[in-house]
Amino acid sequence: MKTERVNVNVNNQPYPIYIGENLLQDKSLLQRHVKGRQVMIVSNETIAAFYLDPLKAIYQDFQCDTFILPDGEQYKTLEYWERILHKLASCNHHRDTTLIALGGGVVGDITGFAAACYQRGVDFIQVPTTLLAQVDASIGGKTAVNHPVGKNLIGAFHQPKAVIIDLNTLNTLPEREFKAGMAEIVKAALIKDEKFFTDLENKMSALLQRNFIFLQAVIKRAAEIKRDIVNADEKERSGERTLLNLGHTFAHAIERLLGYGQWLHGEAVSAGLVLAAQLSHRKNLLDFESLQRICRLLTQISLPIHFPKSINADELLSAMYMDKKVANERLHLILLEDLGHAVVSDQVDDRELKSFLENG
């Protein structure tokens, strides 16, 4: 399999995304984006068991330190972020050090935020090992930790030096996490590319069988969609990047109310995508057949299409107001005018939203 490359250029900060097989064994590639002689690999207990030792061997001629997180969203906190910084300082890492995020979205987010803050900013490389991180979390420079009040409330924009996607890491990804990652691929198609959505409908059976040829193609397309949006609007100033939050205002509220880790992020995103599509249909933006196609595709993946019955409408609405997409005390929701065409709207008032959440 030929390694594919997607080039990102955010504010004159270019970096590559590599997508291929056996990239974690490619010494030249993994050393190419490290400018100094120090690295620190941040991973979690689950991923480290599979991939840490081979990656450390690549950097055997470097000062190579490691920090291993417990596995789970509930550990993406200021406490563990501070522990990473303490390890960097205590091991005397300099400004030319490079952090390597080996893991899923949690590892990438907290590692990137540590890199953004240590000595006012050092390099980091994303090595995402979950499908969700490969198509979304590792691309675009958003780094953050959670706070009890809300998800990703504390963070920074800090672009990686490279994103290295080894498809072989998907072989060790549990089925539930693999399917959760599909939600972000569906989201990318819904935002910008109706043809891509149709391709997903046609190829989903093969994708769920982890066909690497098809997976490489859809990961590349999802990465290109995110690349184009991030290149145009790195820090969500124009509204273009806000489109990437389709379904996420609902999803983040669901995650917080259930307790981080009870639902995987992609599972909450799936329910959020359906809520956004249903609301779009209610407001006469999206036709019923398109809504049905979205529900059918997510159901085929075995992802949730309803928010949990344990959450009531008042709780969900209140939690949604802790979202970063609130401006002038109004929720800015991402809605769909068609498959492949998302828009930002502040034309949904509380009364309408509460009625929608209560009655569907």
Curated annotation (Swiss-Prot):
One of its GO terms (molecular function) is nucleotide binding. Its EC number is 4.2.3.4. Belongs to the sugar phosphate cyclases superfamily. Dehydroquinate synthase family. It comes from Coxiella burnetii (strain CbuG_Q212) (Coxiella burnetii (strain Q212)). GO terms for cellular component: cytoplasm. It comes from the Bacteria. NAD(+) binds at residues 71-76, 105-109, 129-130, 142, 151, 169-172. Catalyzes the conversion of 3-deoxy-D-arabino-heptulosonate 7-phosphate (DAHP) to dehydroquinate (DHQ). Binds 1 divalent metal cation per subunit. Can use either Co(2+) or Zn(2+). Its cofactor is Co(2+); Zn(2+); NAD(+). Zn(2+) binds at E184, H248, H265. Keywords: Amino-acid biosynthesis, Aromatic amino acid biosynthesis, Cobalt, Cytoplasm, Lyase, Metal-binding, NAD, Nucleotide-binding, Zinc. It holds the Pfam family DHQS_C. InterPro entries: Dehydroquinate_synthase, DHQ_synth_AroB, DHQ_synth_fam, DHQS/DOIS_N, DHQS_C. SUPFAM superfamilies: Dehydroquinate synthase-like (SSF56796). Pathway: Metabolic intermediate biosynthesis; chorismate biosynthesis; chorismate from D-erythrose 4-phosphate and phosphoenolpyruvate: step 2/7. PANTHER family: 3-DEHYDROQUINATE SYNTHASE, 3-DEHYDROQUINATE SYNTHASE, CHLOROPLASTIC. Its main location: cytoplasm. One of its GO terms (biological process) is aromatic amino acid family biosynthetic process. It is found in: Cytoplasm. This is 3-dehydroquinate synthase. It catalyses: 7-phospho-2-dehydro-3-deoxy-D-arabino-heptonate = 3-dehydroquinate + phosphate.
